[in-house]
A protein has these predicted regions:
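Accessible peptide chain termini
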Residues: 1, 192-194
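A polyanion-binding, active-site-adjacent surface
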Residues: 1-128, 133-183
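Short, basic, low-complexity termini and linkers enriched in Ser/Thr/Gly/Pro
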Residues: 182-192
Length: 194
């Protein structure tokens, strides 16, 4: 793992997003999802009421691993090893115990596997609301695919439809709605019903 440690803003929130690990650009930027995958992801969340700035100030952003894992031999970012995941898990577990979130949004297969280790395919969990339990906490889980430009899953079927379904579920969730309630101009309930 290559420092620095990258974390989101220390915001108390009923919603917790869990990513995989920072990319090479996130360390210098000092924040998670600071590059192209983030632009895609924040576009998704803007469609259900929170732009990037609002999201970063209202949603707690965690990660399975806190440092850039380095590049993979074949290109792209290396997926953290099981030992690296285990070494970092205490941080995410502590965050869950402090926040006690009502909604957890794991982004990408590694984050999803922390809650559902037997899930093999994204289509098994994207577009569904499930109950999750980790670190002695119980919460709703609505998973999203990783927004990486290298992945076509969220741009082709069935991923495109399942992503839209997942985002609608997030937008309708009471924990998400509570984030919008602090600013009535952010309420998208009419557009979600349309």
């Amino acid at each position: 793992m290559i420092g620095p440690v990258v974390t989101g803003n220390p915001v108390m929130s009923p919603v917790m997003l869990i990513g995989q690990a920072p990319g090479v650009k996130e360390g210098p930027a000092g924040k998670p999802f600071a590059w192209t995958a983030g632009k895609t992801m924040f576009g998704w969340f803007a469609g259900i009421g929170l732009d990037e700035e609002q999201f970063r100030s209202r949603v707690y952003m965690a990660a399975v691993c806190r440092c850039f894992p380095g590049k993979a031999a074949g290109g792209g970012d290396r997926v953290p090893s099981p030992d690296e995941v285990k070494a970092c898990s205490k941080h995410m577990h502590a965050e869950l115990q402090i926040l006690k979130p009502r909604l957890v949004i794991p982004v990408g297969k590694l984050a999803i596997s922390q809650l559902y280790p037997t899930v093999d395919k994204l289509a098994e969990v994207i577009g569904e609301k499930r109950r999750g339990e980790l670190a002695g906490q119980s919460f709703d889980v609505i998973a999203l695919p990783h927004p990486s430009g290298a992945s076509t899953w969220h741009r082709t079927e069935p991923g495109k439809t399942l992503l839209a379904r997942a985002l609608a579920m997030i937008g309708a969730h009471d924990a998400w709605r509570s984030l919008l309630a602090s600013d009535p101009s952010l309420d998208t309930s009419d557009s979600l019903r349309a």
